[in-house]
Amino acid sequence: MSEQIKHECGIAMLRLLKPLEYYQEKYGNAWALNRMYLLMEKQHNRGQDGAGLANVKFDTKPGEQYINITKSNSSKPIQDIFAEAFKDMRLLQKEEPEKAEDINWLEHNARFTGELFLGHLRYGTFGKNELENLHPFLRENNWKTRNLVLAGNFNLTNIDEMLDKLISLGQHPVKVADTAIVLEKIGKFLDREVETLFKQYKQQGLTNIEISERIAENLDIETILSSAAKKWDGGYVMAGLIGHGDAFVLRDENGIRPCFYYCNDEIAVVASERPAIMTTFNVPLSEVKELEPGSAIIIKRNGKISVSQIKQPSPKPAKCSFERIYFSRGTDADIYEERKALGKLICPRVLQAIDYDIKNTVISYIPNTASVAFQGMAEAFTDYANQQKIKAILANKDNLDEEKLKEIFTLHPRREYIAVKDVKLRTFITQDSERDDMVAHVYDVTYGQVREYVDNLVVIDDSIVRGTTLKQSIVRILDRLGPKKIVIASSAPQIRYPDCYGIDMSRLGDFIAFNAAIALLKENGQAGLIDEVYRKSKAQENKPKEEIVNYVKEIYAPFTDEQISGKITELVTPDNINAKTEVVYNTIESLHKACPYNTGDWYFTGNYPTPGGNKVVNRAFINYYEGNNKRAY
């Protein structure tokens, strides 16, 4: 994606299932911390606004700290939190090396030397990236079983409803943030479960110390989660640690946010991305499991691991298709093939745009995340070229000689590395005209590969959201190479609707596809439809989310995809461009063909998997119409 879109965060959980001495003898000191560092670093694409790490120790004495948390919002947050986590151990290695080798001493005296870890990578889609907003969060209590550490990759659409419920119970939340509300929600049912067990064991005549031990053994995590998550509307992977050593990770019933896990006799590990687990622990693809929608993996203090159905899975899961197009790392085996398929499937539209003239066409990609889709497009170009060679040979079979064959076999896709982002370039100028000129130089281009006024130039991008980078930078700088025509190919379909499940795309007016549809309505004398959609949206503003209809679909209904793409081309083409320009998109059908198991396509279709989605798009349109630049949730 040539435009930066902040999106869902990343989680990493590690539970050591054997005594700490086992890992020291087999792997050496700090093995768990090193694994956590790798597990988070291999997911750093999921969060660069901040990072946090929590650790729970099991066998501490009263008065000893058993939960350690560190966070950083610096420019290198992962390195910072692990520098802090390793600090005690490195100091010991310098000053008291014998203690650095004493695992029992370390557990009782050094931080981050326990059995249970939870890491978080933050991309802030809402709120500031101050330390107080970074995960993991801690709900403290003097009872071990009431301490709750929480981190998640999530966004809930009905935080306002949950807040009202807490207030009705007599609580006074000091924050309205979704994480604070969720922490309190789970914490409330954790408290209730502890109180229920306490009364039960008290009636049996047990001492308070005995009761604490029994509660730790018999805490019903399934009941806590099912009660807490009953009314949640949104996409989430919620990870939690309880002070005595239980842990859980819960995935939403639509499977919107991704989650994978791996267990053996030494460890249990959970992460947002499968390749991170495979690389960190050197395990094969077949052994890393996907946490199914609505399920929770629960790891008890005694090492028992179970996967429980907490919420009824949706009959039509809506796993996020944007994960496959852009957000997740392309090193995942399935995602790699899906991105290649997207590149192949857009090829017919690209060929049509260049009038099938591959001899006089250079193909490339921008940015680097589009490289896999480019491979697929290039393969499809090669297939087309081979078909043309076969036709030429058959057409000239009675008149073939060496020269003719050489001529035929010279037809092949011309792949070149055309654009590279200059990551060191910063824009300090504030005047719009001068700043736009500087932005146009964010990308460097390779000269001498495009024949001026002869060649077409095709570049593929993962997706096009706002179109501002295209207009201000990419089209301008590609035009300097002198192509006859510039074709921008998006491997994703047109992004038409806001997200509300963890991606920072909540304002309709930001979307180039929406602006194109609005422009077409006005040009075609149909501006009244905009007013009508506003009236309908405003009329249902205060209805329950379950009753709200997505009327924004009516904005797009009068036009074909090609008409909207044509208007997008006009909107992203700057003045004084010499080359003819065209923007082409993949279709919804192609998306589903390439990504058959991740059918969450609300960005493109407006078909939201939860009622809260319709509420958000309704609010987004009202905000747009009224000139309100606020987020829709």
What are these regions (language model features)?
Residues 1-292, 298-362, 366-367:
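Conserved short alpha-helical segments that host acidic/polar catalytic motifs at enzyme active sites
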Residues 77-129, 375, 380-386, 397-448:
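Cofactor-binding active-site loop characterized by glycine-rich and histidine/acidic residues
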Residues 94-104, 200-220, 383-412, 523-536, ...:
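Short mixed-charge
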Residues 229, 244-246, 251, 263, ...:
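PRPP-dependent phosphoribosyltransferase catalytic core
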Residues 231-234, 338-359, 377-380, 430-453, ...:
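Phosphate/ATP-binding catalytic cores across multiple sugar-kinase/actin-like superfamilies
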Residues 240, 251-252, 272-274, 301, ...:
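Active-site proximal loops enriched in glycine and acidic residues that flank catalytic Cys/His/Asp
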Residues 303-320, 365-400, 404:
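Terminal amphipathic helices with adjacent charged low-complexity linkers/tails
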Residues 363, 370-377, 381, 425, ...:
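Extended, hydrophobic alpha-helical segments in both membrane/secreted and soluble proteins
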